[in-house]
Amino acid sequence: MNGSRIAAVGHYQPAKVLTNEDLASLVDTSDEWIRSRVGIRTRHFAGPDEPVDELAGHAAAKALASAGLAPADIDLVLVATSTAEDRSPNMAARVAARLGIPSPAAMDINVVCAGFTHALATADHAVRAGAATRALVIGADKMSAVTDWSDRTTCVLVGDGAGAAVVDACPEGAEPGIGPVLWGSVPEMGHAVRIEGTPPRFAQEGQSVYRWATTQLPAIARRACERAGLTPADLAGVVLHQANLRIIEPLAAKIGAVNAVVARDVVESGNTSAASIPLAFSKLVERGEISTGDPVLLFGFGGNLSYAGQVIRCP
């Protein structure tokens, strides 16, 4: 087997949009305060009648349509999320039922903001090993449901949404479309990003996360490029976890992808956790900012102080 590839992508965001001015009516904040600290202008929020699997299902349906596939063509469903409403049935099974996928392996992966790139690597390994033929990989989170709306340092960050990718085998003779993953974590610092308590609430130690992301992750991201046989200058695109602009911009600069389009979807969508990478990537594809075959670094990081990155070829 030559390897696997991303055959198609899709994304979905709820219709409700909150501006910084809207948030200023809820907590002690302002448009200037938010934009100067995290670079976010707007975010999308799901309603109480829009569960996570509905967001995921919409994105997945778009990816399937783009790939020209029927639900029955999928035999593996992976959903990266940390905001599932229930422990069982899991989100992957719920999405499969929603879409009419008849008998897939269905698994959730909870690595918070790095979940999608972990799930993508898992799908790549499954397809290359022959354990799956076509995988549906989804990142979906409803961060508004786990937000403390009295904490202005976190409630201004979050948004809801989903992104999805179809992963299948590369055509005969083609180069692998998903490069080797570089992943890991810093367990002793896992408390720096948390969703805990009853009901669960998102909290983080912002300065610790910022220092880790901007000092430790650039070298790791460059190593992910090396594993794909590339340098950062070879990249056409960089899609980092959309944490906030104060992290994205220095991290991208230190990686050294001088010729790449850098996704900044956080400005319009906020931090959507596991959804942020597939959501931003799908938008770059949709807008034509990256082209078929272009090398793109996907690099997730966050909760558990986990990270996972790989270079993929644009579908």
Swiss-Prot record:
GO terms for cellular component: cytoplasm. Keywords: Acyltransferase, Cytoplasm, Fatty acid biosynthesis, Fatty acid metabolism, Lipid biosynthesis, Lipid metabolism, Multifunctional enzyme, Transferase. One of its GO terms (biological process) is fatty acid biosynthetic process. One of its GO terms (molecular function) is 3-oxoacyl-[acyl-carrier-protein] synthase activity. It holds the Pfam family ACP_syn_III_C. It comes from the Bacteria. It is found in: Cytoplasm. The active site is at C113, H241, N271. SUPFAM superfamilies: Thiolase-like (SSF53901). InterPro entries: ACP_syn_III_C, ACP_syn_III_N, FabH, Thiolase-like. The last Arg residue of the ACP-binding site is essential for the weak association between ACP/AcpP and FabH. Catalyzes the condensation reaction of fatty acid synthesis by the addition to an acyl acceptor of two carbons from malonyl-ACP. Catalyzes the first condensation reaction which initiates fatty acid synthesis and may therefore play a role in governing the total rate of fatty acid production. Possesses both acetoacetyl-ACP synthase and acetyl transacylase activities. Its substrate specificity determines the biosynthesis of branched-chain and/or straight-chain of fatty acids. This is Beta-ketoacyl-[acyl-carrier-protein] synthase III 2. The lineage of its organism: Bacteria, Bacillati, Actinomycetota, Actinomycetes, Kitasatosporales. The gene is fabH2.
